[in-house]
């Protein structure tokens, strides 16, 4: 007892900050310490033998430089596997393709951005040059100089291979339009948030210090000078789900948007009669017109713009469409087709450890079929491959596809290049990345600088609130990363940047990376041609292959498609398939025309039957189906909208949107989703459960996110058991029966969706289950805990939170348009909590960068009780609290001092940003109080 008392007296009163300061750094080791099969492997690992890319001799990786070499003192894992050797088959030398000339060396000034024909201001040309664009290719110049394009008088549809410079043409046309017409705006539409964020950075860099051609009014007043300069500058804003921008249509010159946000912006501009300010619309990835989920929104946008007949230039581009002429005819545009690739790409097929040129794939399959029926010689004897991969003695590489993948990846790295590996699922990403990392060269052979960069990457990921993924921890130190939708945004960005900068040598990704992120590689390896269970389409395959070859770094690129026996015929057909023709998504089975007509009527674009017919004539649907059929579809859609009370027919035979129809359009819901939300909200008005928050979380659960949710019924039952009276009443009120949940647990059955009633019931239960995840997010439960509780990836939860922000805003706007002001006010308050990921008492602190949810609560509990306290804090005092954000990392083995120092450095940098952000917000609030 006395011993205990002495310990207490010596320590005194300790806060959690004091305890955190005393804790040693303890995290999982950098990689698993699996022992190699034999001691001989350690000697062989450093001298793998394989074929170098394009005959290039191997470049040895950096090694230590003597006794005085100061390298990080960390325990590094050794390679456990040895990649198989790649051998060239005698008599099949690789044909050398002629490389294209540098565009700046041909056709003189025509290919220079300084050419007066382009009419670009010197500041813009200088910014392009600073970004590495000093000249353009002949096809780009020919396209830009097409009649009426640079003056904005003609629309343009064009195609070019991935990496061929498509975006530059649209950038030049759009920027020229904005610079020369200071009162006009532009909208740039991209399909994915990652692409929007990437484009925002690029455009802001390009337009820095570039001014619009504004007329000088001669006002000598110096106080007006700054205002005039602001008016001349080009303002670029991003509009996408989960963005925190406060910019509006009036605050921007170029709006970089996702498809949904762009459609909403155009609807608002039409409704407010400000559409005349729009000067250009750029549609990147135009093949998305054909997407069954979002394509119809692109067609809606273009149709509305065509009907308006305003002076708006439409520019559409894609690498994977075949009916360019039809699309150009639809919008009365010039069209241009380029097949030029600045970096040539060689394509290969790998089957049964043999490498064949992709051009011989059909011959390969035909020969294999004959051998199967006749029992002839080995395939490699009948159709000699260009190269072969030796079978592996390692059990993990006994599968020829895995053996080929590892061999090709290691061969690329050993030659000094980067490899991008595509696979069919999230789980496969992690498994294959781990497999490749086991055969990578030992980190001990790296120089201090390269090893330091990898350790910095580990420290950066370790400092995130979600912590460092154990699977990534094992592969990153070996130079291998993976990238999929199950990861958080911060993880994906850090991994992508590290690969782009050469810190990581191999990146294993799902197929969606090819469309969503621009990460080229010297060699692209496609391990199987399936995405999940489905075979990828020709367009997706082209996009993956198009990532091969990095302009400015590589003079060539290569793609390798690894295929198994069961898929060989399908892959042969795939390699020979043409790009799919784009079709309209307004067809009856896709129900897109209902939304198209509702939006046009609600925004006042059309009303009478004659005007509606003119509107239908502007659709792609009208160009691709029989004219009578298109009008028949129109009549059916109008009748459905009227029956659903979204529109009504006036006595003068004109249509007008009802209050419900206006609310559906204003909130950016599809008609069917809007009707479901209406019924839910109408029921909530009768008895909204106000003594808890479960009812609000249910209402804010996005319909699309819930539709993709797989319910874990035992977890659902456990969650219901934890609810208080208020929560149970709220869920029972919306239609959740705890008894039904128990029966699903006992039976192990899945939800039936055979009838409309069953579909509605399934939607309710999925939304209720997803609402628990939103509740946890808003109640400051750490992301890893939520991920473990619901058995779903952290990235999925983060995506849910981002989707929820947009959906919640739509719900609030819906209530406002319906005149339900009190309900809108209640929901709007809870929307702030959702965005902050915290309870009401932390909303002010949650405005600060890096301070969200659990982090905000820890700061408050450890003395930083408000915004002012954060603003006045010493960053060093915040670091111990940041160490507590991810406690599971402090319960394992100690970090080596070198790693601990890097980790602490990352946390200190974040603490400094937190203090600076808090200061900025605090000063702004004080200024508002002074002004009042």
Where are these regions (language model features)?
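Conserved segment of the helicase C-terminal RecA-like domain
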Residues: 519, 523, 530-574
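C-terminal or mid-to-C-terminal helical accessory/interaction module adjacent to the motor/catalytic core
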Residues: 555-638, 651
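C-terminal helical accessory/scaffold domains
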Residues: 599, 635-644, 648-853
């Amino acid at each position: 007892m006395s011993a205990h008392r002495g310990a207490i007296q010596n320590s005194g009163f300790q806060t959690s900050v004091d305890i955190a300061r005393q804790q040693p750094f303890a995290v999982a080791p950098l990689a698993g310490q699996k022992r190699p099969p034999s001691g001989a492997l350690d000697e062989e690992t450093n001298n793998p033998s394989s074929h170098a890319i394009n005959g290039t001799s191997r470049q040895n990786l950096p090694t230590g430089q003597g006794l005085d070499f100061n390298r990080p003192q960390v325990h590094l894992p050794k390679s456990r596997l040895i990649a198989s050797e790649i051998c060239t088959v005698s008599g099949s030398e690789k044909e050398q393709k002629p490389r294209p000339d540098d565009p700046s060396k041909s056709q003189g000034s025509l290919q220079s951005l300084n050419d007066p024909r382009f009419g670009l201001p010197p500041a813009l040309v200088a910014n392009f040059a600073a970004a590495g664009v000093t000249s353009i290719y002949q096809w780009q110049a020919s396209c830009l100089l097409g009649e009426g394009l640079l003056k904005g008088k003609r629309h343009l549809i064009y195609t070019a291979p991935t990496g061929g410079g498509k975006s530059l043409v649209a950038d030049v046309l759009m920027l020229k339009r904005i610079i020369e017409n200071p009162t006009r705006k532009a909208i740039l539409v991209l399909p994915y948030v990652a692409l929007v964020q990437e484009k925002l950075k690029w455009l802001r860099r390009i337009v820095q210090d570039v001014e619009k051609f504004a007329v000088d009014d001669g006002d000598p007043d110096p106080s007006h000078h700054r205002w005039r300069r602001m008016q001349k500058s080009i303002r670029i804003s991003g509009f996408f789900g989960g963005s925190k921008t406060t910019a509006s249509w009036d605050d921007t010159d170029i709006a970089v948007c996702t498809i949904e946000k762009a459609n909403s912006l155009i609807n608002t501009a039409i409704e407010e009669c400000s559409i005349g300010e729009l000067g250009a619309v750029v549609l990147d990835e135009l093949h998305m017109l054909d997407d069954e989920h979002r394509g119809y929104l692109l067609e809606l946008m273009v149709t509305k713009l065509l009907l308006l007949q305003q002076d708006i230039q439409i520019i559409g581009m894609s690498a994977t469409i075949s009916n360019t002429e039809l699309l150009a005819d639809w919008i009365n545009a010039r069209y241009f087709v380029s097949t030029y690739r600045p970096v040539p790409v060689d394509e290969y097929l790998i089957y049964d450890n043999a490498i064949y040129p992709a051009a011989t794939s059909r011959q390969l399959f035909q020969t294999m079929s004959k051998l199967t029926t006749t029992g002839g010689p080995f395939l490699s004897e009948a159709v000699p491959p260009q190269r072969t991969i030796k079978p592996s003695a390692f059990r993990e590489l006994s599968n020829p596809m895995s053996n080929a993948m590892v061999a090709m990846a290691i061969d690329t790295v050993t030659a000094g290049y980067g490899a991008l590996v595509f696979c069919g699922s999230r789980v496969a990403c992690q498994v294959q990345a781990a497999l490749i990392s086991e055969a990578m060269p030992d980190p001990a052979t790296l120089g201090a600088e390269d090893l330091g960069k990898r350790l910095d990457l580990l420290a950066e990921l370790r400092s995130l609130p979600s912590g460092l993924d154990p699977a990534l921890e094992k592969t990153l130190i070996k130079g291998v990363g993976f990238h999929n939708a199950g990861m958080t945004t911060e993880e994906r960005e850090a991994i992508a940047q590290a690969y782009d900068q050469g810190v990581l040598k191999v990146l294993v990704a799902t197929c969606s990376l090819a469309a969503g992120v621009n990460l080229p590689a010297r060699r692209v390896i496609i391990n199987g041609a399936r995405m999940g269970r489905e075979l990828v389409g020709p367009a997706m395959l082209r996009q993956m292959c198009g990532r091969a070859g990095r302009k400015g770094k590589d003079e060539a690129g290569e793609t390798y498609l690894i295929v198994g026996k069961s898929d060989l015929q399908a892959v042969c057909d795939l390699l020979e398939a043409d790009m799919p023709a784009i079709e309209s998504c307004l067809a009856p089975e896709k129900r897109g025309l209902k939304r198209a007509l509702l939006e046009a009527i609600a925004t006042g674009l059309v009303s009478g039957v004659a005007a509606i017919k003119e509107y239908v004539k502007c659709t792609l649907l009208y160009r691709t189906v029989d004219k009578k059929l298109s009008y028949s579809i129109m009549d059916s859609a109008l009748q459905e909208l009227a029956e659903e009370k979204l529109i009504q027919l006036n006595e003068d035979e004109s249509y007008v949107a009802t209050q419900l129809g206006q609310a559906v359009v204003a909130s950016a819901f599809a008609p069917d989703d809007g009707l479901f939300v209406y019924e839910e909200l109408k029921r909530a008005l009768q008895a909204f459960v106000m003594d808890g928050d479960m009812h609000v979380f249910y209402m804010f659960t996005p319909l699309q996110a819930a539709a993709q949710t797989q319910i874990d019924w035992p977890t659902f039952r456990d969650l219901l058991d934890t609810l208080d009276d208020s929560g149970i009443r709220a869920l029972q009120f919306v239609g959740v029966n705890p008894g039904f949940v128990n029966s699903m647990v006992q039976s192990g059955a899945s939800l039936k969706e055979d009838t409309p009633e069953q579909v509605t019931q399934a939607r309710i239960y999925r939304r209720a289950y997803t609402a628990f995840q939103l509740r946890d997010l808003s109640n400051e439960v750490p992301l890893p805990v939520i991920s473990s509780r619901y058995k779903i990836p952290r990235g999925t939860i983060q995506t849910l939170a981002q989707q929820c922000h947009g959906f919640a805003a739509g719900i609030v706007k819906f209530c406002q348009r319906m005149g339900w002001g009190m309900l809108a006010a209640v929901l709007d308050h809870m929307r702030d909590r959702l965005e902050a990921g915290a309870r009401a008492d932390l909303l002010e602190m949650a405005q600060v960068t890096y301070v969200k949810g659990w982090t905000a609560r820890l700061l408050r509990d450890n003395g930083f009780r408000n915004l002012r306290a954060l603003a006045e804090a010493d960053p060093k005092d915040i670091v111990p609290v940041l160490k507590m954000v991810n406690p599971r990392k402090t319960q394992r083995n100690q970090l080596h001092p070198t790693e601990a120092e890097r980790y602490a450095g990352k946390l200190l940098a974040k603490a400094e940003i937190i203090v600076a952000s808090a200061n900025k917000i605090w000063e702004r609030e004080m200024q508002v109080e002074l002004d009042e």
